[in-house]
Amino acid sequence: MHIFGKILGAFFGLLLGGPFGLLFGLFIGHQFDKARRLSQAGFSTGGFGKGPSQAQRQEEFFKAAFAVMGHVAKAKGQVTKEEIQLATAMMDRMNLHGEQRRAAQDAFREGKESDFPLEDVLVRVKISTAGRFDLLQFFLELQISAAFADGAIHPSERNVLHKIARGLGFSSEQLERRLQMQEAAFRFQHQGGFHGQQQGQYQSSGWQQASQADQLADAYKILDVSPEADGKTVKRAYRKLMNEHHPDKLMAKGLPPEMMNVAKEKSQEIQNAYDLIKKVKGFK
């Protein structure tokens, strides 16, 4: 717990200004504790002079991603084995070793603390990304992916995700839509996806109808379009998502280089869903 500032502020506030001074001292002390906590977690707290460099902004984004991931994992009261495995797998996907891996692990542990300043960290994320929609969306989707570590969203995790979405500037409707997309992506991936199915059932007699229908339904949800959508609508949705998730474009906007592989996997997921719809529906 970080309460040193509150205690000190309350003491001097009461000493110098009575009850009103006590309240003012508590407020000032609280601000001090928040700034100290953010600084210890590796986040810039602003101030005068030059703003953070690109490398510093990327570092903030990186640490915040793992810290908030830890906060989501702790939402149910206890971090599960699956959630720890997902965080470890995420570090593996990013090829994190040595200092980088330790920084990610430290941030994840920081996020699990009961007094983790979620709202303040999200403010820092918005500042470090200059409010760029694509980067904020990537950050939110990363947290959603973490919440799906065990294949389902717990109500407590959903509540935390709503706080994260609001803090980043997304509406509840936008979050729920992304939750549906991620749930479909989770099923799509664990069923082998389009290219995985091509290697097996589809080679000779095709998929079983139920399997094909489920895969196709998930592919439409990944692209966030209706199953009744025509080819032009599907292609437009595909291009929009690819433009928002293109790894090179995200890197140019400030995505940490360590997260490039995760961005590539997301764009491949979108590509696979589009390829499946084209194959089954005969779109060109």
Swiss-Prot record:
Q: Which residues lie on this side of the membrane: Periplasmic?
A: 1-6
For this protein, the record's Pfam families field holds: DnaJ, TerB
InterPro entries associated with the record: DjlA, DjlA_DnaK_co-chaperone, DjlA_N, DnaJ_domain, J_dom_sf, TerB-like
Cytoplasmic face: residue ranges? 31-284
Q: Which CDD domains match?
A: DnaJ, terB_like_DjlA
Keyword annotations of the record? Cell inner membrane, Cell membrane, Chaperone, Membrane, Transmembrane, Transmembrane helix
Q: Where is the J domain?
A: 218-284
Q: Does the keyword Membrane apply?
A: yes
Localization, UniProt? Cell inner membrane
Q: Which GO CC terms are listed, alphabetically?
A: plasma membrane
Q: How does it assemble?
A: Homodimer.
Q: What is known of its domains?
A: The transmembrane domain is a dimerization domain.
Function, as annotated: Regulatory DnaK co-chaperone. Direct interaction between DnaK and DjlA is needed for the induction of the wcaABCDE operon, involved in the synthesis of a colanic acid polysaccharide capsule, possibly through activation of the RcsB/RcsC phosphotransfer signaling pathway. The colanic acid capsule may help the bacterium survive conditions outside the host.
Stated name of the protein: Co-chaperone protein DjlA
Q: Which gene encodes it?
A: djlA
